């Protein structure tokens, strides 16, 4: 029997990796071994950063809410506590959006929180 070297399968595998490495800088999109390493790292970064993105956005929202709350004479923690006492359930994403795009509505929420805090 003739020896089968698996050329078609190997070429397909290498081609798939090099296609995934398209756009990478330098040898990382040309050489199979370095491309494979970079693609593996890319999968790791993508997995890690999908989780990191959630933390980053929460941080951003809290920063925006804090800035708007301080313009209304409250700290972030006081505002959140006041809203909880007033039984106003608005998540941080919506609060941050109000702080940026609708200052009047945010001020109304801040006033409701102040009233419950007794300020």
UniProtKB/Swiss-Prot annotation:
GO cellular component: ribonucleoprotein complex; ribosome
Disulfide-bond pairs as recorded: none
Short name of any one Pfam family annotated for the protein: Ribosomal_L20
Domain of life: Bacteria
Gene Ontology biological process terms in this record: ribosomal large subunit assembly; translation
GO molecular function: rRNA binding; structural constituent of ribosome
PROSITE patterns named in the record: RIBOSOMAL_L20 (PS00937)
Keywords, alphabetical: Ribonucleoprotein, Ribosomal protein, RNA-binding, rRNA-binding
Entry-linked InterPro entries: Ribosomal_bL20, RIBOSOMAL_L20_CS, Ribosomal_protein_bL20_C
Family the UniProt entry places it in: Belongs to the bacterial ribosomal protein bL20 family.
Entry function: Binds directly to 23S ribosomal RNA and is necessary for the in vitro assembly process of the 50S ribosomal subunit. It is not involved in the protein synthesizing functions of that subunit.
Protein name as it appears in the record: Large ribosomal subunit protein bL20
């Amino acid at each position: 029997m003739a020896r089968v070297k698996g050329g078609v399968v190997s070429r397909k595998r290498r081609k798939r990796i090099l296609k995934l490495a398209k756009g990478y800088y330098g040898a990382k999109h040309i050489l199979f071994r370095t491309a494979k390493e970079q693609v593996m790292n890319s999968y790791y970064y993508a997995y890690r950063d999908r989780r990191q993105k959630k933390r980053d956005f929460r941080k951003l929202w809290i920063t925006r809410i804090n800035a708007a709350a301080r313009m209304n004479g409250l700290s972030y923690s006081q505002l959140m506590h006041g809203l909880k006492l007033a039984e106003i359930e608005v998540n941080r994403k919506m609060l941050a959006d109000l702080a940026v795009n609708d200052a009047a509505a945010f001020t109304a929420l801040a006033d409701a929180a102040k009233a419950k805090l007794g300020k």
